[in-house]
């Protein structure tokens, strides 16, 4: 310890390694700059060390004595010796932000750079701060300059703002300014994996010390692993390649301490990011697409030139830390984050977000132009299926990215009603409609549009008080009263139906897993007043949890089994005699209405599978799943993996079959990209199935505009009232095939 202030300049044993890329912070001595009083030679000790309990005066700042080993915040570890840190024999690794009280030469005084006046030095001038220095220096530590060259006075700004939220800002900003060296974060992770704590400007090691020497463990060769982080920090980048944003698996991206002036909108493609560091650049704004990064927990924007933030950042409902120190942020935004923290600012942006322009209308895709252009009367039917997201499920805990107004049922139900009226389909199948909404709103409102409805709530509503039962959701099926006659309606409760099966005795899984789920299907049997065609319309909602694939499969099997029984009953249903639709009496002066065509007689069907079948609903099963394959292929083996060897009577012993030839309506275009759209889940869950032997799909409602989706991370929002989208299909009833009779022209001459 006798060598004092010259100690860190003495050559040590082993080889020295220096940064190959010149950096202003990697010097062995301080270089005099214009307007500074930095020393040009060796200085003696400054014994007038200020108390750690107060900020030191600028004239006695530790920066004026760069060789003072007693300043904890200015250690001279700029050299690696023998592949290790130059100070490794004296220092010990300690937890972050804990004072190193066992180091007698650490005075724990803050480090004010009063001798730097250029804006660029805020980024490029970098010294080593030990972990204990930062904690002990706070709350006194604040850089005396920011990127735009304007000085800040700590005492003026932090009197009221020095709460826990702003303290965290200052601490993280200080850490960020230490991380200006190239690939700092990547090197830190690599060194920590080897058991070494790296200094900010530590050069990369080129040698490994032997096993066990100086407590350093030699890295073991390991197989290649997947990576999820990318560090481009300190590279002087001025632009980013578009290829970068194809790495959609990235979870951490460091672009700090570069020269970026703009962030490309394609940043929105990296939707798995949870950590994004853009500190120390020249950014003046952020793109709207930043709101697509809903998994972000840390977003560092320290030391840029950002004055305002896009409202789309309100979508970042998981964001825990937003670093904005060192930006000329406007007073309103800065006040929110200084006083209440990141969560309050994000909530403010979310609730104040303006309503954007709606997307273009979804295309109407015509698959059979002959059916649309035909002049003769054709037997057509349009069917809409829609999971409306019931009021009790639309909570901030589930949909934190949606403003409070968007989640309010009064707002959403009006959007739903307007959408139903605009499509004006013959049949509507709604899932997740509670009893109160059906009885008090939709049934009344849709009656003005010639609809009649059939509704059943889920099983839990039985035994409840009337007021409580109103909040239980169920399935509602509406049909045009002027076009169809309701012949029959049935409820299928999957759990109750399963326990009534003769083979359910002794099957524990039926009671423990299936019976507890109260999901249902509503079946209506309709007849077209004019053509006499009959339809079985199914409206189903299956269990959602992916961990219960066996339950969804058995629910589907029970549904198809019950439909098989019902279809055979409906095949023997007697003809309908009174088919005239109700008509209001004519008022005086009202013009004569044209007479209706004479209704055709009721169609007769030889078997249940000949009746046109339309099966709609939220099956919570994606294409290729066991439930999907059972419906599409008509059978499923008893040993299917989704059953997980659980016991469900004959369904798991014999297998599952059904006689219907069903196809997905949207299978004609390869299915939609999604029917359920949230930040964490985007998949196909909703379907309109039809019996291909009796129906032909002629038109479909297309997908949501792709450009619109580039700025919207999930539904519901101001234009889509549910996390699901509506499905709409048009079908043409196939004519019955009669017996082919060959004409007899008599004997023919050769």
From Swiss-Prot:
Entry EC number(s): 3.1.13.4
Bias (Polar residues) ranges: 48-58
Ranges of Basic residues composition bias in the record: 102-118
UniProt GO BP: DNA replication; DNA replication checkpoint signaling; nuclear-transcribed mRNA poly(A) tail shortening; positive regulation of transcription elongation by RNA polymerase II; transcription elongation by RNA polymerase II; traversing start control point of mitotic cell cycle
Residue windows of the LRR repeats: 249-270, 272-293, 295-316, 318-339
Alphabetized Gene3D superfamilies for the sequence: Endonuclease/exonuclease/phosphatase (3.60.10.10), Ribonuclease Inhibitor (3.80.10.10)
Subcellular location: Cytoplasm; Nucleus
Residues bound to Mg(2+): 432
GO cellular component term of the entry, any: P-body
Region: Disordered, residue numbers: 31-60, 98-124, 175-194
Family recorded in the similarity comment: Belongs to the CCR4/nocturin family.
Name of this chain's protein: CCR4-Not complex 3'-5'-exoribonuclease subunit Ccr4
Gene name per UniProt: ccr4
